[in-house]
């Protein structure tokens, strides 16, 4: 069995917001999967406790350093108000999200970010404010989707951006 450290989650908060989370623990196998489970649980606990995106990512960073020194992970955390489309995002060494606008344009976002989790106990993770228009698509992904051996990762990101721009919008009911 092949297991790894990638994870994603959608967490409903008490304030009717949605936390959209994606992360990638270094390595493969049981150790990476175990660390992933701990990080996923930590992110859930910080989120349910009402922490801001920066606090969630900073707290998860500190936890990883304490629990598993030498291990690291990337993470992107977006706290979305689905009614207004407003979101706050924090990023820890994770690939930039993509945004497909309602008119079909797709772009690689330029979110501020900090270092990967597990490296610097004093790291900060600045928040970036986003506004998602009705019909927009926010794409979170791990490097495994866009990495090709021997190729620049930016080429893979561009292929994904192009595919997202060319995708036919489908109502959620379908």
Cite the ranges covered by each PLM segment.
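Catalytic core of PPM/PP2C metal-dependent serine/threonine phosphatase domains
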Residues: 4, 12, 18, 30-115, ...
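Catalytic-site or vestigial catalytic-site microsegments of nucleotide-handling domains
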Residues: 22-28
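DG-centered beta-turn motif at the end of beta-strands
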Residues: 24, 94, 142-144
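Residue-level marker for buried hydrophobic side chains located in beta-strands
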Residues: 21, 91, 138-140
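Active-site-proximal, acidic helix/loop segment immediately C-terminal to a metal-coordinating Asp/Glu
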Residues: 28-50, 108, 121, 126, ...
């Amino acid at each position: 069995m092949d297991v790894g450290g990638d994870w994603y989650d959608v967490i409903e908060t008490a304030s009717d917001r949605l936390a959209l989370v994606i992360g990638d623990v270094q390595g493969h196998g049981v150790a990476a999967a175990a660390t992933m489970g701990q990080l996923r649980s930590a992110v859930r606990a910080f989120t349910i406790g009402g922490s801001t995106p920066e606090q969630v990512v900073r707290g998860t960073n500190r936890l990883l350093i304490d629990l598993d020194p030498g291990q690291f992970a990337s993470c992107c955390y977006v706290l979305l108000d689905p009614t207004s489309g407003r979101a706050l995002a924090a990023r820890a060494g994770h690939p930039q999200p993509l945004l497909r606008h309602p008119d079909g344009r797709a772009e690689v976002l330029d979110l501020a970010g900090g270092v990967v989790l597990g490296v610097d106990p004093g790291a900060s993770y600045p928040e970036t404010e986003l506004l998602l228009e009705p019909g927009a698509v926010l794409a979170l992904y791990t490097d495994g989707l866009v990495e090709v051996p021997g190729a620049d990762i930016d080429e893979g990101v561009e292929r994904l951006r192009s595919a997202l721009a060319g995708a036919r919008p489908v109502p959620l009911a379908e």
